Regions:
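A glycine-rich helix N-cap at a beta->alpha junction
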Residues: 66-93
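Short, solvent-exposed coil/turn linker segments
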Residues: 4-5, 55, 76, 110-112
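Boundary-proximal intrinsically disordered activation/regulatory segments immediately upstream
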Residues: 1-69
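Short, charged beta->alpha transition segments
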Residues: 86-91, 99-111
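RNA substrate-binding interface of SAM-dependent RNA methyltransferases
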Residues: 37, 44, 75, 81, ...
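A generic structural signal for short, non-catalytic loop/turn and secondary-structure boundary residues
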Residues: 25-26, 47, 73-76, 95-97
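Structural motif
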Residues: 29-30, 50-52, 78-81, 98-102, ...
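Short secondary-structure boundary/capping segments
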Residues: 22-23, 72, 91-94, 109-113
Length: 124
């Protein structure tokens, strides 16, 4: 049986809620992908998924697909957090949340040195 977090004061819930704000996203270096479609797209991409948040009654159209993608990406039960409906609504920015969201690490864009010939124009 999975533990369901219902307290809005739980550190995990507070962290997820903080990701709604720019300050929280900068502090944790992550953002929330909310909803079935966006969650599935992030799991299929090269983005680094940190944790999944699932509402206690989640049974969306793509639930089976989402859980299969989570498993494929190595996000086991230790990286899936089950929230009560009220805690999930607290974290969600949607009026009618779909019941699943993904915490994704913000990619760091490292500038690459140009390969081959390069022309740099400055002050033109």
């Amino acid at each position: 049986m999975n533990t369901i977090i219902s307290s809005k004061n739980n550190p995990i819930v507070k962290r997820a809620a903080a990701l709604k704000e720019k300050k929280g996203r900068r502090e944790y270096g992550a953002f929330l992908a909310e909803g079935e479609k966006l969650t599935a797209e992030c799991l299929r991409s090269s983005l680094q998924a940190e944790r999944a948040y699932v509402s206690e009654n989640y049974a969306g159209k793509r639930a089976e697909e989402i859980f299969a993608l989570l498993e494929k990406r190595g996000l086991g039960e230790d990286k899936i957090t089950y929230l009560s409906e009220s805690a999930f609504s607290f974290v969600s920015e949607e009026k009618t949340p779909q019941g699943v969201m993904l915490e994704v690490k913000i990619p760091v864009n490292v500038p690459r040195a140009p390969e081959g010939d390069c022309l740099i124009l400055d002050g033109i």
